[in-house]
Amino acid sequence: MDDLANLVFPGQQVAVTWDGSSSTEALKEFVSKLQEVVAPRGKVSVENIERLLLSAHADSSFDAILLGMVQGTQCIHSSEVLAEVARILKPGGALIIQEPVAAGAGAQLRTPEHLSSVLKLSGLTEVTQLLQEPLNPEQKQGVVELLGYNGNDVSTIRIRAKKPNYEVGSSRQLSLPKRKTAEKPSVDPAAAKLWTLSASDMNDDDVDILDSDELLDQEDLKKPAPSSLLASGCGEGSEKKRKACKNCTCGLAEELEAEKTPSTVPKAAPSACGNCYLGDAFRCASCPYLGMPAFKPGEKVLLNPTKLQDA
């Protein structure tokens, strides 16, 4: 066993864990040596690793916690246990952990790198490897029986890690440099005066205001003749068919369209005698308009269907 004076110091509150694989005599001897180091003001507490999560220690209770340090202990410390250790350690407190590791990944045991990573993820810093040594035959047998690993790449590693000098969730004000206020660009007085229009200038006799009625003369107000709007050569020549240009704006397209559309003016409805509209005195015996009042020529008159059948 290395000199404990390098692991704990006088006056500290120290916690030591053990499990079913730990030797009872070795545990008593180890605790006795620790008490000699931390005495008289220090204290050593002993915890079963399986009951640590149920012990409900207050935050920041211990200056140092030793995991797996009792002779004969073969234990893999879970992430939950390591997180609890980080909680009950005082700011700046130290964790010394010792457990078996494997050289290759994928085994039941962690690799040294994996163990260091788990400690950092638990909130600990300054992770330092103190030693790594091969197992003796008795320790190898314990790994096989207790952990179920029968590889030849097993060794024991001891690592020291520290809790940061602040509590988890604590806050501190950051002294950030003050932001410089942007300076406004300087304004040239001459340029400002050039673009400034005084209200009094609007009534100044020297200011000439254009009369909108004088902008157009009489020629501009005349309605142009349609022929003057035609483009050069538009629709000219009797030997060729008149055709409007694409996107015609001179009115030729509308003119040609009007020529194609037949007149829809209704013609006056003719009658056999031509006198039906004058009244019954001028209607023949078979006239369907008998009994109806006189109407204007071309006026639309609705006839009784019965009279149409009789006719």
Curated annotation (Swiss-Prot):
Pfam families: Anamorsin_N, CIAPIN1. Keywords: 2Fe-2S, 4Fe-4S, Apoptosis, Cytoplasm, Iron, Iron-sulfur, Metal-binding, Mitochondrion, Nucleus. Residues 234-250 are annotated as: Fe-S binding site A. Component of the cytosolic iron-sulfur (Fe-S) protein assembly (CIA) machinery required for the maturation of extramitochondrial Fe-S proteins. Part of an electron transfer chain functioning in an early step of cytosolic Fe-S biogenesis, facilitating the de novo assembly of a [4Fe-4S] cluster on the scaffold complex NUBP1-NUBP2. Electrons are transferred to CIAPIN1 from NADPH via the FAD- and FMN-containing protein NDOR1. Monomer. Interacts with ndor1. Interacts with chchd4. Belongs to the anamorsin family. This is Anamorsin. It comes from Xenopus laevis. The lineage of its organism: Eukaryota, Metazoa, Chordata, Craniata, Vertebrata. The gene is ciapin1.
